[in-house]
């Protein structure tokens, strides 16, 4: 009986930290991020994951999309002077 109680206590307390860490990974995946040791050049750090990993999300470019051609032919070069 003591062995059963001991194993139950060990398994119960062992599962608690793992559930806590799962929360961080779930939060990162909800924002389409990935947990990794370091972010790439085209990624930004948006949150922290477990075991000192970083939640990195790909940076969206702020340039005009292919479908947006409203300023084409206006003579504007798009550079700052």
UniProtKB/Swiss-Prot annotation:
Pfam families: Defensin_beta_2
Record carries keyword Secreted: yes
Disulfide bonds: 28-55, 35-49, 39-56
Keywords per UniProt: Antibiotic, Antimicrobial, Defensin, Disulfide bond, Secreted, Signal
Signal sequence residues: 1-20
Predominant place of localization: secreted
Tissue: Only expressed in epididymis (caput, corpus and cauda).
Gene Ontology BP annotations: defense response to bacterium; innate immune response
Region (Disordered): 62-81
Domain of life from the UniProt record: Eukaryota
Compositionally biased region (Polar residues): 62-72
InterPro entries reported for this sequence: Beta_defensin_dom (IPR025933)
Gene Ontology cellular component list: extracellular region
Family, as annotated: Belongs to the beta-defensin family.
Described purpose of this protein according to its UniProt entry: Has antibacterial activity.
Protein name, UniProt field: Beta-defensin 34
Upper lineage: Eukaryota, Metazoa, Chordata, Craniata, Vertebrata
Gene: Defb34
């Amino acid at each position: 009986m003591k062995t059963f109680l001991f194993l139950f206590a060990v398994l119960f307390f062992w599962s608690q930290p793992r559930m806590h860490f799962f929360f961080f990974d779930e939060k990162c995946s909800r924002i389409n991020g990935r947990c990794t040791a370091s972010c790439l050049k085209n990624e930004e750090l948006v949150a922290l994951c477990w075991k000192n990993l970083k939640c990195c999300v790909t940076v969206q470019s702020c340039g005009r999309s292919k479908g947006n051609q409203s300023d084409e032919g206006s003579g504007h070069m798009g550079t700052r002077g």
